[in-house]
Amino acid sequence: MRNVIKLTWSRRKRSASLDKGENIMKLAFAFATAAIVVAAAFPALADTLTVYSPQGGERGAWIAEQAKAAGHEIKLLNAGGGELYDRLIAEENNPQADVVLGMVDTSMALLKKEGLFQPYSPSWAKDLPAQYKDAEGLVHKFWQTPIVLAYYPDRLADPDAPKSWLDLTKDDYEGKYVIGSTAAQTTRMYLAGILVRFLDADGEVSDEGWDFLDRFYAEGIIANDADSQLEAFKSGRASIDLNWLGGALKRADDLDAKVQVIDTDGGTPVISEGVAIMAGTDQLDEAKAFVDWWGSADVMAAYAAKFGQVPVLPEALAKSPATVQANAKLVNTQPIDWDAIAPKLDSWLQKIELEIRQ
């Protein structure tokens, strides 16, 4: 049954009818105003922030849980660094990610070159050392991982250990070190660290560098996977480990042996994982808030306490456990311009596969 307001030309009834119409208009306006107030007080919930990251397993779960506790609803898409890189390139015209987190220097440099990131200076960036942020303000790095040269003192006396990566081709070390697959991030990074020592004036690897790498492969133990690498150490053949710091410590634990990290002449390659906001995100405010939270000193220190990773933010390192602070001082960093070598690395690795690695 409908309520109908009948308008008549009687002065009295017309007045009464208009009063009713005015009341309805006022009521409608009141409801509209109330709706606006409610909308302001309870804004629509933002969509979940999509974060692409190689951090998976326990580490990925920790990131997601801590982010949620801090008020950030994220969906963490986890895959290997190479797979994520390919996916981001494939999605360039229809980006699905809002934030990229935890990819290494070379990958971030190439993605940046493709124009996939937008500038943003996080709240913690002002205290970040210069080598961990780019001039464009696109990528900011938050922890570092040394790619170390280490040895087992029960197999190789301290005075006999190599002093430099370039010592490995000496006769004393033939058959004592293991070279992994070029598909592995660690292998790629120490090969880059070796080759940049032989760059000519044009930034290309000299013949001397390729000759060195020929000898390096000829005298090493080539093992494509973790099991065969571990077996080379278990058998007693290998005594020198070319590994990321955490991997070297884990391998020593698996072998129930002591390992010694070498602070090499010429420095140690150190890779850093970064964070960046995608240029195509439609959740810019949420992405900025997440990046501010993620790289903050308290979050980085908590991650360091949980997983032993060394943060690069000085305040975060100061709040980290003593063992993490000690690991930060183990080696001197080899100066490497990752942005400069990133576009060249794949061609170097291809040459190694086709012409050197047997």
Curated annotation (Swiss-Prot):
The molecular function terms of the Gene Ontology recorded here are: thiamine binding; thiamine pyrophosphate binding
Note the CDD domains from the entry.
PBP2_Fbp_like_5 (cd13551)
A single GO CC term for this protein reads: outer membrane-bounded periplasmic space
Q: Does the keyword ATP-binding apply?
A: no
List cystine links. Answer: none
Q: Mind listing the UniProt keywords for this protein, alphabetically?
A: Periplasm, Plasmid, Signal, Transport
What's the name of the protein? Probable ABC transporter periplasmic-binding protein y4fP
Question: What phylogenetic lineage does the species belong to?
Answer: Bacteria, Pseudomonadati, Pseudomonadota, Alphaproteobacteria, Hyphomicrobiales
